[in-house]
Amino acid sequence: MVRLKDIALQAHVSSATVSRILNRDDSLSVTEETRERVLRIAEELGYQPSAKRRKPRGYGRDSAPLIGVVSCLSPEEERQDPYFSAIRKGVEDECFKQEIFITSSIHLGSFQEHIFHELDGVIVIGSLHDEALTSISGTFKHAVFINSTPNPARHDSVSADFYAAAQQAIEHLLSLGYERLGYIGGQEKEHTVKNGVNSKRTIEDKRLTAFLKTARPQPDHVKIGEYSMHEGYRLMKESIAGGTLPDAFFIASDSMAIGALKALQEAGLQVPRDTAIVSFNGIEEAEFASTPLTTVKVYTEEMGRTGVKLLLDRVNGRTIPLTVTLPTSLIVRQSCGS
């Protein structure tokens, strides 16, 4: 059994500090780096807190439910991805508000190494392939999926309509008079586990589907890599080297767009004078990019909070599965020229 002392030794803090961080004591004055280090070590060690909990506000059970969080991303991937880290923050904030401690927080690759029989339910962040979905469904009575909608006749889910949101962004560019549009994006992945190894497969990316249907681009104006800032930089350099630059780009994540901006600046090109950009996700950094980004705002923290509420409703007796699709907003800034 992992003790607070074990976490404290690895994190180089006191056991009291570990306890207060794990219990979300907002009166504790520590750096964000220390807090994240303690939470990461606790997760990596598989720390299991006491099952004694206070009843969440507004729910009828005598004790609070025991819930877990399963992330399809590795710890490193999640830390580097503002989109998914914001979803987790929403989950954690709502659990704190409801006075619930997340009993288990694990990543898909280590799923089979944990014991879950005492949990009332889990929140799954990300997209699962059939095998992993079957494993989750067979292990937990209640599961809520965030950022995917598997089997809506059985499971609750929270997501955003990426197709409609992307279409709105592309139509905004077209309405401004841009005719030749380019696309920079990554690959949408589904996750599964085989023999304890986390593997992925590429699935349809609704943002790309919307772009191809709405913009009807030239094939060489569509650049696909991985969802990262570095890949956005690389793919924009590739576009610049190709000769004729599109009038405007729809870039499928803010992080990729920030990388793309750097490539354009290095080439002496200005946004939106030489090419315009609309991106996706609405992370905080988009507002403070070298050219503030017009972006589709996805309410990721609210997705996390809603997932917790749905799970509590399920545990409290609701039997009808709910599919929640949150709205998005187009935040217009300097990068699109309007």
Predicted regions, residues:
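N-terminal helix-turn-helix DNA-binding module of bacterial transcription factors
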Residues: M1-Y59
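Short acidic/polar active-site loop segments enriched in Thr and Asp
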Residues: S14, Q48, P65, D120, ...
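Short acidic capping loops at alpha-helix termini that bridge into adjacent secondary structure
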Residues: E179-R180, Q218-P219, V271-A276
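Alpha-helical recognition/docking segments in bacterial nutrient-uptake
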Residues: Y59-E171, S175, A241, S255
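Flexible loop/turn connectors
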Residues: K237-S338
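Hinge/beta->alpha junction and helix N-cap segments in small-molecule ligand-binding domains
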Residues: S74-S85, I106-S110, V158-Q168, I184-K237, ...
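Periplasmic-binding protein-like
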Residues: F116-I125, G182-G185, V222-K223, G243-S253, ...
